Amino acid sequence: MLQLSFITLITLAVTSLAQPATLRLNFTPASGKFNDATKQYQSIWDAEGRRMVEAMEQVSGLKFQETDVRAIVYEGVSDSGFADRPMRLRASYPEGVKKATLVHELGHRLNIQVRRRPKELDEHRVLFLYLYDVWTKLYGKEFAGEMVEVEKKRKGIYDYESAWQWALSLSEAERAAKFKEVVKMNLSGRK
């Protein structure tokens, strides 16, 4: 019996070492007035973060390289940050848009691995090759469609509307194939 327990412990230890590193998001309010929004982002992440990461990795075929990401909750334009620069997330979004925004901004961080791309594909067009499909996998087509409409209404910083129209003019299979081409460009460039 003791030998069986020892073997079980060794198996569990080896299994946990073989698991991929968990992506942790550390949410901080920019000021006290964003405490509630910060708690909501944290609650979403605690409940759904693992599923989000799994869906993003499965659909994109990429794996997150980071293990810890700082996220500041404030009232301004959401931004993925980069390396040591924290992610910044808008406080006033409703819960559904907060979920979509987390996936969107994490997608930019995931895409750091695919810097080489055809000239006609900017960073959002690359992201949109799989973002809709991740949202669909996580929350269904209705949610994904609603979030596309939310993003299409954003004006000034980027032309989300034409980027989404372009991405969704392709079938799911065409988007996936195009994204694989981008990934392949980056793999062939590694030594």
Segments (PLM) and residue ranges:
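Boundary at the C-terminal end of the N-terminal hydrophobic targeting segment
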Residues: 18-20
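Short pre-active-site segment immediately N-terminal to the catalytic Zn-binding motif
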Residues: 85-102, 118
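Bacterial N-terminal signal peptides
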Residues: 5-16
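Pan-zinc metallopeptidase signature
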Residues: 152-191
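Extracytoplasmic/secreted proteins, especially bacterial periplasmic and envelope-associated proteins
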Residues: 51, 55, 97, 101, ...
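Auxiliary, metal-adjacent structural segments of Zn-dependent hydrolase domains
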Residues: 25-85, 138-140
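Active-site recognition of the HExxH zinc-binding catalytic motif
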Residues: 100-113
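Post-HExxH zinc-binding segment in Zn-dependent metallohydrolases
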Residues: 114-163
